[in-house]
């Protein structure tokens, strides 16, 4: 059966490609008080990423757990951001993110360090494709705030190429010289 296109030229009935991995971070039972008592439902927090530099998070509420997870996953796919990765495994520079009372510090790490991060931050780094990072969260331990603070910090990351382009310089002019550092240490 041939695929048909709709009026806007988009493919119809196209299944979502399984290029994204997702991780359920938190699931809570929530209640709404109504005239006759309480109505219970579920809230899900999901992180989605392609493990190649794109990540997003979403939250969904529903009366059943699978429906809440589905809603959260759809929202996460709509809210994805792109983060430049150094050598496809770590961050380009140290950064700081904040949301509410949640503060997060993220530092680059040498190869083989692994992901040193707690709870929700680890899920974000794994879905992003980061293999080496050291991070610390201070303040709020609420998973929503921790993820938002992490995303806030990741949005601030800039690759040396983009910084050089903005300044009108070459990448080599911005990065520290490798040959000069050991020579200065010996003197």
From Swiss-Prot:
InterPro entries, per the entry: Ribosomal_Su5_D2-typ_SF, Ribosomal_uS5, Ribosomal_uS5_bac-type, Ribosomal_uS5_C, Ribosomal_uS5_N, Ribosomal_uS5_N_CS, Ribsml_uS5_D2-typ_fold_subgr
Residue span, S5 DRBM domain: 20-83
Superkingdom per UniProt: Bacteria
Gene3D superfamilies in the cross-refs: 3.30.160.20, 3.30.230.10
Gene Ontology CC, one term: small ribosomal subunit
One GO BP: translation
Role noted for this protein: With S4 and S12 plays an important role in translational accuracy. Located at the back of the 30S subunit body where it stabilizes the conformation of the head with respect to the body.
Assembly and interaction partners: Part of the 30S ribosomal subunit. Contacts proteins S4 and S8.
Name of the protein in question: Small ribosomal subunit protein uS5
Gene for this chain: rpsE
């Amino acid at each position: 059966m041939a695929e048909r296109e709709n009026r806007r030229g988009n493919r119809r009935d196209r299944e979502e490609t399984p290029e994204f991995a997702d991780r359920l971070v938190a699931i809570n039972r929530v209640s709404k008080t109504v005239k006759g008592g309480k109505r219970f439902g579920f809230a899900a927090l999901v992180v989605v990423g392609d493990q190649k530099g794109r990540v997003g998070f979403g939250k969904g509420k529903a009366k059943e757990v699978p429906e809440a997870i589905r809603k959260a996953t759809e929202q996460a796919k709509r809210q994805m951001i792109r983060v430049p990765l150094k050598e496809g495994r770590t961050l380009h520079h140290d950064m700081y993110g904040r949301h509410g009372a949640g503060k997060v510090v993220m530092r680059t790490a040498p190869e083989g360090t692994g992901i040193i991060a707690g709870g929700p931050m680890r899920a974000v780094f794994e879905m992003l494709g980061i293999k080496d990072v050291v991070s610390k969260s201070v303040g709020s331990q609420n998973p929503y705030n921790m993820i938002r603070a992490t995303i806030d910090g990741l949005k601030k990351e800039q690759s040396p190429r983009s910084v050089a382009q903005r300044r009108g310089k070459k990448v080599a002019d911005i990065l520290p010289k490798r040959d000069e550092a050991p020579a200065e240490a010996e003197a």
